[in-house]
């Protein structure tokens, strides 16, 4: 892969989950930052990638690489596919590979941190939010209903940010990761340097599997 100018790894959410179209990228790598700009306006989650992953190995070999995450697995979602095609064509246009008269340039957020909100209860998950929704601390995300006694256990957001991924309505067990929240960056958190993974969601109290398991 060392002969490549750049790589884009296309992903869906993991089983029983969905993602809003987004890029996973190491935003401390200047070459990767330039590649991200080529997509136009698109949500970006700063994350250097798991060791051994294609994205991280390629970047360490000097090939700028991002992961484009979108939609659900095992389904043909025409709107998600069309969105992904537009993003790739925009990148190709900006790289001079493909010619067309327009491309997207809307501003989109870069999230330097993210966390999964997990349920403490088992039962039937019923969500009140959708991917892409902006949230603040205390907002109701959804509830888990005990099918035996119909008791409802609400799930509230402890963070301010945006729902960038989430579990589909389903049967869940205690500890199940349900809502992936892109955390709104503060001015201080924007001051990251090369090799700093503390803003990627891999540290700071999150379980090691919180990001790696569902990338």
Residue map of PLM features:
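Structured catalytic-domain cores with a bias toward divalent-metal coordination
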Residues: 1-215
């Amino acid at each position: 892969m060392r002969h490549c100018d750049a790589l884009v790894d296309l992903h869906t959410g993991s089983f029983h989950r969905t993602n809003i179209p987004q890029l996973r990228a190491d935003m401390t790598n200047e070459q990767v930052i330039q590649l991200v700009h080529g997509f136009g306006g698109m949500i970006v989650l700063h994350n250097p990638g798991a060791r051994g992953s294609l994205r991280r190995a390629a970047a360490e070999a000097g090939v700028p690489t991002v992961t484009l995450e979108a939609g659900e697995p095992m389904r043909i979602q025409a709107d998600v596919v069309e969105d992904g095609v537009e993003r790739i064509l925009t990148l190709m246009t900006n790289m001079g590979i493909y010619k067309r008269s327009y491309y997207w340039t809307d501003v989109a957020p870069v999230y330097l941190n993210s966390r999964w909100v997990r349920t403490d209860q088992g039962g039937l998950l019923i969500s009140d939010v959708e991917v892409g929704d902006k949230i603040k601390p205390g907002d109701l995300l959804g509830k888990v209903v005990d099918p035996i006694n119909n008791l409802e256990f609400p799930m509230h957001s402890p963070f301010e940010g945006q729902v960038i991924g989430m579990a589909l309505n389903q049967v869940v067990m205690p500890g199940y990761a349900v809502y992936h929240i892109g955390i709104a960056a503060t001015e201080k958190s924007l001051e990251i340097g090369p090799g700093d993974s503390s803003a990627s969601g891999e540290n700071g109290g999150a379980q090691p599997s919180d990001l790696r398991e569902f990338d």
